[in-house]
Amino acid sequence: MLITVRDPSPTLRCSSLNRRLIPTKHNLSPRLLRSSFRQHNLSLRLRSSSSSNLYTSCDLANFDPLGINPDLSSSSTWRNLLTIFQTSSQKDKPRGVAAAIEDSSIDFGDFFNGPLPGKFLKLLGFLALSRLGVYIPLGGVNRDAFLGNLDQNSLLTTLDSFSGGGIGRLGICSLGIVPFINAQIVFQLLAQVYPKLQDLQKKEGEAGRKKLLQYTRYASVGFAIVQAIGQVLFLRPYANDFTTEWALTSVILLTLGSVFTTYIGEQITELKLGNGTSLLIFTNIISYLPASFGRTFSQAFSDANYVGLVTIIVSFFLLVLGIVYVQEAERKIPINYASRFTSKSGGIEKSAYLPFKVNSSGVMPIIFSTSSLALPGTLARFTGLSSLKTAAVALNPGGSFYLPFNILLIAFFNYYYTFLQLDPDDVSEQLKRQGASIPLVRPGKSTATFIKTVLSRISVLGSTFLAILAAGPAVVEQTAHLTAFRGFAGTSILILVGCATDTARKVRAEIISQKYKNIELYDFDKY
């Protein structure tokens, strides 16, 4: 914008702009005045947006210092009122790339603009392949007799829900992803004992993580062989003709089925739509859900227990709401940065927060506790000792010692796994490197001690939540006199909710990332 002053009158000199543009003395030469105006005109061209506001306030036609003209005073009053009630987002609205970054809204059409439809088709194909192996049964087994024993074993019923009914159908993929999960758990524990494994995970970057993943694959094959042998020995009373050839063939088929399922899980992970292991378990639990609720409804209608049925349904929805609330709950610790640029304000941000999940360990403590309580039964099956059989009966779901031992083990594993995922010393060192600090806490050891105290208190809340989640369904069953949660306990619901929320975040992040790729850096008129 170009401002041209033709007559430097005394009236014009009283405005703030022209005090800077025009010298107060009139005895200057016309040549010097023209030079001064030329320089100011050049600077005003470069600042057109700010000069337009200055010109509006310094216009001769609007100059009314005594308020004689009522039209002008009223218009300026309305203009001032509009400015006061204007929101900060409208005042400081970012432009250009900053506006594109802040525009994180997602429309339904954004889903079809990128590669997400193709990824979802691949995901459905992989999940269908994983379910196909469940329906291919092992030969030579009396399935009806086996199912009668399966309904009486609560632990096997729970594992059957994780495999999507694969154990009950005696499918070749009945082991599922469980051997790979066991291998991951073992390597996570070994990483705390052997520093070399910890260096592979943290210091060697992507190459180290790939090498650790390769070790986990090898270990998962070993776990699959051991579990396949255990399953074949468990099926021995139900086999039509238990021979060495049948046992060897069954072990090979079960091992290959587990390896195939693990491969599918890794392919799903590469799609970046969620964790492949979690999505496989999610699919298996969803497939088991109709049968579980079908048995509940048939039992309720046959016994005319309608009050119990309503209690079960209400408890289920309350359980889902409670899980969603706790899964999204965070303990936010404020932190101050020395300096950090943000696109939201277009400047330097000096404060943020450090989020800690209330249930940061997820479902892993419950899985650890369930595996520990199942250990006496597994050993009793191999050894045949009467003492182990007695302990297994007491520690099975419904046993006298099941509930107290389950709560104690959940609390222990939750505390351990919380600090396994978040090392206070490591977090303190990272904050120090980034120039961040917690208010009223010194950097270094004091910060690590503060974070350890916060995590300890959070682990108490998380342990209480997981204990209620593990014991709640059993209490509801005893109150309603229905076995609705048999094989579909709070653990399964926690996995369902956690996997669904994680996949929703991944899909949203993928859509936003696709929008960022389409930003035209020099299309400022669009924003």
Swiss-Prot record:
Topology versus the membrane: Multi-pass membrane protein
GO CC terms, sorted: chloroplast thylakoid membrane
Subcellular location: Plastid, Chloroplast thylakoid membrane
Keywords assigned: Chloroplast, Membrane, Plastid, Protein transport, Thylakoid, Transit peptide, Translocation, Transmembrane, Transmembrane helix, Transport
SUPFAM superfamilies: Preprotein translocase SecY subunit (SSF103491)
PROSITE patterns according to UniProt: SECY_1 (PS00755), SECY_2 (PS00756)
Source domain of life: Eukaryota
Protein known as: Preprotein translocase subunit SECY, chloroplastic
Organism placement in taxonomy: Eukaryota, Viridiplantae, Streptophyta, Embryophyta, Tracheophyta
Encoding gene (name): SECY
